[in-house]
């Protein structure tokens, strides 16, 4: 199938069943793209093996749907949500203005990325922090974020400045 990624297409959240948003599965490699009934040739098998070695180790954060601990040069939590981008940044700005845009002690918001129409806030963790270590703080962030998403008042000056800082650290992945 030939696909030109520059052509307009549906957004990911338009084709996913958002009622099943929390029903995600982490895969060990990219073999899920292939039909299990078909034989994979040797060069494809080698490529899959090589890619398996390069996949960023990722674990779900216990008790927080959409939050994933990732091990890179440092450890991070990526928090995947299906919230509207404007509302999400407003809510994060409210938390940031209060010093609450983190997933626990020693963590900090480092930015976010947009992919397939979704915004994914990213938090850097203190050295050696595991997924279970950050679960309580990530659960607290999820509750605070849910509450902040219900606020409809305009942002105050401090929150607007915080929002500008948050948005300036957002990148789009295509």
Regions found by a protein language model. Give the residues of each.
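Long, charge-dense low-complexity segments
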Residues: 1-118, 147, 151, 156-159, ...
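A short, solvent-exposed beta-edge/loop patch
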Residues: 111-152
């Amino acid at each position: 199938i030939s696909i030109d990624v520059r052509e307009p297409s549906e957004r990911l959240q338009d084709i996913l069943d958002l009622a099943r948003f929390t029903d995600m599965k982490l895969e060990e490699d990219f073999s899920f793209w292939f039909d299990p009934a078909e034989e994979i040739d040797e060069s494809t098998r080698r490529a899959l093996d090589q890619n398996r070695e390069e996949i960023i180790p990722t674990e779900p954060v216990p008790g927080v749907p959409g939050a994933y601990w990732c091990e890179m040069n440092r450890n991070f939590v990526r928090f995947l949500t299906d919230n509207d981008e404007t509302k999400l940044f407003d809510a994060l700005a409210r938390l940031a203005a209060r010093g609450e845009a983190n997933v626990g002690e020693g963590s900090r918001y480092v930015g976010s990325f947009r992919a397939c129409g979704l915004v994914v806030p990213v938090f850097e963790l203190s050295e050696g922090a595991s997924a279970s270590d950050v679960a309580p703080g990530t659960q607290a962030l999820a509750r605070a974020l849910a509450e902040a998403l219900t606020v409809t008042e305009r942002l105050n000056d401090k929150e607007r400045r915080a929002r500008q800082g948050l948005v300036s650290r957002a990148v789009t992945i295509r």
